Amino acid sequence: MSALDAYKIRQDFAILDQVVNDEPLVYLDNAATTQKPQVVLDTLMAYYHEDNANVHRGVHTLAERATAAYEASREKLRQFINAKSTKEVLFTRGTTTGLNWVGRFAEQVLEPGDEVVISIMEHHSNIIPWQEACKKTGAKLVYAYLKDGQLDMEDLANKITKKTKFVSLAQVSNVLGCINPVKEIAKLAHQVGAYMVVDGAQSAPHMAIDVQDLDCDFFTLSGHKMLGPTGIGVLYGKEEILNQMNPIEFGGEMIDFVYEQEATWKELPWKFEAGTPNIAGAIALGAAVDYLSALGMENIHAYEQELVDYVLPKLQAIDGLTVYGPENPTQHAGVIAFNIDGLHPHDVATALDYEGVAVRAGHHCAQPLINHLGISSAARASFYIYNTKEDCDKLVEAILATKEFFNGTL
């Protein structure tokens, strides 16, 4: 049994107490965004009520308190991912921003004939920046494909060559739910002198992250997918690499000195944080990290595995329902994409909503993967710390009711 008590955890999330379409809300769209515990909401309000001031600028009391809280949150994030230094922890708007920043760095170093290796399962945020970087530099974008609903490691290893300059992969697929062995892949990348980039949007909220152990060169995460506010995230980069990177945005507070014709930059991490940052979001993300750390990331991962072990076989047993990704629950994170024969995923999601069950339907910002699977879209249920086995049962019951309803109307 897991050390987590989901029923106790749910008490911290007032939003989950509501009724939707005369049914208790079952929120299973956590891969899109997570709900926020009361302590995160309180932290946001406390900043605006008590400490609202700009950071790194003023010497008055409010400014000093805001700056201290902002930088304390950076230290919490450093510990959360086990970076060596807060110099390696850059606040961003989210994973998309972080990957775009890495893409801009790639434009500095890529040359014609170089290659960037990604996988077919990537989120658009880990595809388009590389497409653009390759277009601008004459480099080539190379895809690794799937085997049995997972990354084909043999194919990936064959694609990583002396031409490879970047390897960029999601640690957990936001559609297939498979967990990619990024530590092993980082070794392959470094053997040929390539940079290893990890999209941690779907992994950082759900498992312990140690960027030093992974030996990745970059790692990105989004606060809103791990109980924090929207509009805040982190890009981790090894200090020696970040020192090589040009600033992405220019303006206030990222400068050391501005002359009439040129300027010099501050040291890390501030040379990448131009303008007034999302101060409240960063501080509240620190509160979210405190909340998750108190539960224990190992406990969170183990509990979510219990839910997957419980619900995945039930879904696989439903006649006419196809689950995408690994068949073995132990290889499947808490993201389950599926389709029902003869039904459009949007109709399925709408019908489930009538039963109070919130899931997502669409291409999940992964159109190359969806095309590769030979489908146009899929429904997706995704789980988190406040979900229960009763939520799993409700999902299965709602799917069966949906099938029965549409079978009666077709």
For each of these PLM feature ranges, what is it?
Residues M1-L410:
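Pyridoxal 5′-phosphate
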